[in-house]
């Protein structure tokens, strides 16, 4: 058994699609739009075959909180410490908030954590 995909609500579907394509080499399918339900989504497929569905419905405006129950972050493995550093530096230079890192965690992971445009936490690790 494997996870088929995970999904996240977003406010700006096109901006978030561009984010995952530009920084994480994702490839989006064609836009799905259900007019009756005011719902739109893209499935973004990454090099590993993992898929993320980004979804918009009406006005989802509640900002994420780091202290709520539910999903905490999504993590991307980039293959090396150097690539963690490079991608973190690129995201920081482009104006994204670096929440922490790059650093080695107490349990031995090398990672950084950034916020996307909508405040979702993205972990970048080896």
From Swiss-Prot:
It comes from the Bacteria. InterPro entries: Fosfomycin_Res_Enzymes, Glyas_Bleomycin-R_OHBP_Dase, Glyas_Fos-R_dOase_dom, VOC. Signal peptide: none annotated. Coiled coil: none annotated. Residues 2-126 form the VOC domain. PANTHER family: GLYOXALASE_BLEOMYCIN RESISTANCE PROTEIN_DIOXYGENASE, LYASE, PUTATIVE-RELATED-RELATED. This is Uncharacterized protein YyaH.
